[in-house]
A protein has these predicted regions:
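Pyridoxal 5′-phosphate
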Residues: 1-139
Length: 139
């Protein structure tokens, strides 16, 4: 498994120990996944009926925390079960976000629930664009 992760990204030019290749590969993979997540956040943020769950607005500008490559969102007026079914029908893997008191306080239940999307090294920019098109068809 370690060798697989060490070989995910080509182009390493340093001392080719497995440890160095693994660090290079994981750093590059992290940057790639964060880019996909940021693009998804940006594109979904342009859809008026979509509410992205989490830190946003002025609070996000000062947030200097690293985030994992996943995002939860809801579509106002569309139950999360409907969003999930549409995503799955279009070949997009997602999960329904479980209700919690915190999410209830954030208004997630009021908008019909939320779904969560997680990025993997095998996702592409095309996957992000397909996801956004699918969500836009609901909004």
């Amino acid at each position: 498994v370690v060798d697989h992760y060490a070989s995910l990204v080509e182009g390493f030019t340093g001392r080719a120990t497995r440890r160095n290749r693994l660090k290079y590969s994981l750093d590059a993979t992290t940057a790639y996944l964060n880019g996909l997540r940021d693009d998804l956040h940006t594109f979904l943020g342009t859809l008026p009926a979509v509410h992205i769950v989490g830190v946003s607005g002025e609070a996000a500008e000062d947030a200097r925390v690293e985030r994992i490559p996943r995002l939860a969102f809801g579509v106002t007026g569309v139950p999360s079960e409907t969003v999930l079914r549409r995503l799955l029908a279009n070949g997009i893997v997602a999960t329904q976000t479980c209700a919690t008191p915190l999410l209830d306080d954030m208004g997630v239940a009021d908008m019909g629930g939320a779904v969560t999307i997680a990025m993997s090294p095998f996702n592409t920019q095309n996957d992000i664009e397909q996801l956004v098109r699918t969500v836009a068809s609901l909004a």
